[in-house]
Amino acid sequence: ADKFKDKGDFLIFEAFNEIHDGGWGWGANRNDGGKQYKCLNEWNQAFVDAVRASGGENADRILGIPAYCTNVDISLESFVMPEDTANDRLMMSVHCYDPYDYTLAATKNEWGHTADASKKVAGDNEGDLKRVFEKIYVNYISKGIPVYMGEFGCVNRATVREQAFQQYY
């Protein structure tokens, strides 16, 4: 923080990237009584305090605060926005790779209402993704907590047809 304290407000810091125990949100965090969530919330507070204490432009720089694993669903049960000496300068950071079987595992290579049912993830693909954004809005944005999606997307696809679904996603 000290190295960049004199850089303008075009620079935003984010505390961490995808902090988790190796289980990507499906590990010990599920049954440790909230210990990992509490630890990350404490680290986020320490991050805000350290950046603010360095002075200069950092006194009111916008800071990105990640939830556990930057996962929208996990954040609903665990995220605590740190206290801050600057007003309205913290943003929640989330990532979205839903549905996993399409975006990262690539076990399904088509997505959406026009996809071949045997080649897409079951369910209402567009509706399921819309619900992710609704969760973000209802639980954070509507309550005055700004959110940015630091990562969103899916792995590359091999065929022209699969690439068309990737673009649609």
For each predicted feature, which ranges?
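C-terminal/domain-terminus segments
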Residues: 150-169
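Short, acidic/polar
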Residues: 129-136, 167-169
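Active-site region of glycoside hydrolase catalytic domains
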Residues: 2-123, 134-154
